[in-house]
Amino acid sequence: MNLLSSDGVQVLPRPFTLNERRREVRSFVLRQGHFTPAQKRAFDHYWPRFGVDFIGQLRDLDVLFGRSAPKVLEVGFGNGAALRFAAQHEPRYDYIGIEVYAPGVGRLLNGLAEDGSRHVRLYHYDAVEVLNKEIVDGALDEIRIYFPDPWHKKRHHKRRLIQPLFATLLVRKLRVGGCLHMATDWADYAEQMWDVLDATPGLVNRAGLRGQVPCPDWRVQTRFERRGQNLGHRVWNLLYDRV
């Protein structure tokens, strides 16, 4: 039998010991960046309302949000513009955002408080860790990944987020009938996304093999997108269904 605490955490049969936690290898570094005073205050005032502290135990997301609704995850939300826009325009969904860049988290916290949002929760942590240890398989209706770091030098391509193991992890967390939406303004990253996702069991490109879709109305144009367009880059929107 699964035991749930009041904050939606599924209590595991044997939690990690302190020594086990120390031995874990982190695949990321939390990025502090330059905090404005307002962003610092946002963490102090609004993290208890919107933030989720990583504890390494599976969560019941319906308990976490206090309702049963479709769950959307945005990985690497940056300054939070896309996530905030979606929360404003699609209130029937519950949103989970993950970001390692602290000033971006602070900026979004301020925006969510200004909007009076009730259906958004944020992690300031690594997406792989959160997905592996806190999200139940099949719990998500949609995953959104917009303009991940392209690591444009060829020798750095191995650092890109969209790799076979990560794609398999995303498939596990999506329910059948859910979808994965990604956007990039780097042509060779779009090619890599197609290579990886077309070869991942459980995903089917809604636009056909190596196809793309128009920008959906749920995605606002980000500053990264505008910057890319100013540099002459086009944007690829890839939409995959979980089957």
From Swiss-Prot:
A GO cellular-component term linked to this record: tRNA methyltransferase complex
Which Gene3D superfamilies does this chain map to?
A: Vaccinia Virus protein VP39
EC numbers listed for it are 2.1.1.33
Residues where substrate binds:
K153, D185, T222, R223, F224, E225
Please name the PROSITE patterns in this protein's record.
SAM_MT_TRMB (PS51625)
Which residues catalyse the reaction? D149
Enzymatic class: transferase
Question: What reaction does this enzyme carry out catalytically?
Answer: guanosine(46) in tRNA + S-adenosyl-L-methionine = N(7)-methylguanosine(46) in tRNA + S-adenosyl-L-homocysteine
Keyword Transferase present in the record's keywords: the answer is yes
The pathway to which it is assigned is:
tRNA modification; N(7)-methylguanine-tRNA biosynthesis
Query: A single GO molecular function, which one?
Result: tRNA (guanine(46)-N7)-methyltransferase activity
Q: List, alphabetically, the InterPro entries matched.
A: SAM-dependent_MTases_sf (IPR029063), tRNA_(Gua-N-7)_MeTrfase_Trmb (IPR003358), tRNA_methyltr_TrmB_bact (IPR055361)
Q: Superkingdom, according to UniProt? A: Bacteria
Keywords, sorted A to Z: Methyltransferase, S-adenosyl-L-methionine, Transferase, tRNA processing
Q: Where does S-adenosyl-L-methionine bind?
A: E74, E99, D126, D149
The protein's job, in short, is:
Catalyzes the formation of N(7)-methylguanine at position 46 (m7G46) in tRNA.
Q: Which family does it belong to?
A: Belongs to the class I-like SAM-binding methyltransferase superfamily. TrmB family.
**Name of the protein in its database record:** tRNA (guanine-N(7)-)-methyltransferase
Q: Which organism is it from?
A: Xylella fastidiosa (strain Temecula1 / ATCC 700964)
